Swiss-Prot record:
Tissue specificity remark: Accumulates in mature seeds. Expressed in seedlings (axes and cotyledons), meristems, vascular tissues and emerging lateral roots. Present in abscission zones.
Family (UniProt): Belongs to the glycosyltransferase 8 family. Galactosyltransferase subfamily.
UniProt GO BP: galactose metabolic process; response to abscisic acid; response to cold; response to heat; response to oxidative stress; response to salt stress; response to water deprivation
Phenotype when the gene is knocked out: Impaired raffinose accumulation in response to heat stress.
Superkingdom, taxonomy of origin: Eukaryota
E.C. designation(s): 2.4.1.123
Function statement: Galactinol synthase involved in the biosynthesis of raffinose family oligosaccharides (RFOs) that function as osmoprotectants. Promotes plant stress tolerance such as heat, chilling, salinity and methylviologen (MV), a superoxide radical generating drug, by mediating raffinose accumulation, an osmoprotective substance.
Reported cofactor(s): a divalent metal cation
Leader peptide range in chain numbering: none
PANTHER family linked: GLYCOGENIN SUBFAMILY MEMBER
GO (cellular component) term, any one: cytoplasm
Protein's name according to its UniProt entry: Galactinol synthase 1
Pfam families named in the record: Glyco_transf_8
Length: 344
């Protein structure tokens, strides 16, 4: 086990992570990755994420896996923000008529394509409605061979189809309601929120994911359910601070230390900052208003816009472009050259 990482025997325990004293930030085969589809306003979330990673001085790039329906204008915006744009083809479940918890979840199966980005040894996936408020590059140094993510909460109404919701059981507070083994059998495996996870791209895994999807009936939470099923044997929980789902603020406030949170997931209804009105349930809370403002502070900060590094090639190109101008001035007799003294 790597230095700075401990894990108890309790299956419910999360991996405890400490920042290494000398993080290896020179690896070019690591990256963050997000997903974008369509011509809507989610591009604002991705721009905000790119600027947030820049603000916390992440050493690694942001790759945007996007479907073909993302317009050229949005692609240019993301390239101008320093993102690496990768077009991917859609992935559909075998039965599109399945009732998902949210209708748009069907397109999220396309996220499986990120497992073929094998030019990277490790990647951290982040949804476009996530913002990073502290550097999390150290997560890349966690031991290989696992998928790391934060456990989800089952207390919102979107989980009403599950036995967990019906008996008020939640893995975020397993001591409050004991799982009834006699009636329901063994408790379910730990379940992560797929808005943020650390994984290892691999072509064999990628092909097997697609094969397995073809014979797996779709379920309400689409690719999140599928990933939990597929990776349940290698999933390792990490602390809540790496993916604060906003519902935790009112469902499990005892588990949240807002001042220590590194990553915020604006997935609660009405919480996406670029659509925020404050009218939906729980959106009038002061902590929500503060987090929405915090996101906008980053998005609106022009100093965080990507600045292309000046290279020797760029400088030479500039000089070449100036030659006709200098020649014209010389011929007009308006430019006199002064021989520079020798440096010898």
């Amino acid at each position: 086990m790597a230095p700075g990482l401990t894990q108890t025997a309790d299956a419910m325990s999360t991996v405890t992570i400490t920042k290494p004293s000398l993080p290896s930030v020179q690896d070019s085969d690591r990256a963050y990755v997000t997903f974008l589809a369509g011509n809507g306003d989610y591009v604002k979330g991705v721009v905000g994420l790119a600027k947030g990673l820049r603000k916390v001085k992440s050493a690694y790039p942001l790759v945007v896996a996007m479907l073909p329906d993302v317009p050229e204008e949005h692609r240019r915006i993301l390239v101008d923000q320093g993102c690496i744009v990768r077009e991917i083809e859609p992935v559909y479940p075998p039965e599109n008529q399945t009732q998902f918890a949210m209708a748009y979840y069907v397109i999220n199966y396309s996220k499986l394509r990120i497992w073929k980005f094998v030019e990277y040894s490790k990647m951290i996936y982040l949804d476009g409605d996530i913002q990073v408020y502290e550097n999390i590059d150290h997560l890349f140094d966690l031991p290989d061979g696992y998928l790391y993510a934060v456990m989800d909460c089952f207390c919102e109404k979107t989980w009403s189809h599950t036995p967990q919701y019906k008996i008020r059981y939640c893995q975020q507070c397993p001591d409050k309601v004991q799982w009834p083994k006699a009636e329901l059998g063994e408790p379910p495996a730990l379940y992560f929120n797929a808005g943020m996870f650390l994984y290892e791209p691999n072509l064999e895994t990628y092909e097997d994911l697609l094969r397995t999807l073809k014979i797996t009936p779709p379920t309400p939470f689409a690719e999140q359910d599928f990933l939990n099923m597929y990776f349940k044997k290698i999933y390792k929980p990490i602390p809540l601070v790496y993916n604060l789902v906003l519902a935790m603020l009112w469902r499990h406030p005892e588990n949240v230390e807002l001042g220590k949170v590194k990553v915020v997931h604006y997935c609660a209804a009405g919480s996406k900052p670029w659509r925020y009105t404050g009218k939906e349930a729980n959106m009038e809370r002061e902590d929500i208003k503060m987090l929405v403002k915090k996101w906008w502070d980053i998005y609106d900060d022009e100093s965080l816009d990507y600045k292309k590094p000046v290279t020797v090639v760029d400088t030479e190109v500039d000089l070449v472009n100036l030659k006709p101008f200098i020649t014209a001035l010389t011929e007009a007799g308006r430019l006199n050259y002064v021989t520079a003294p020798s440096a010898a």
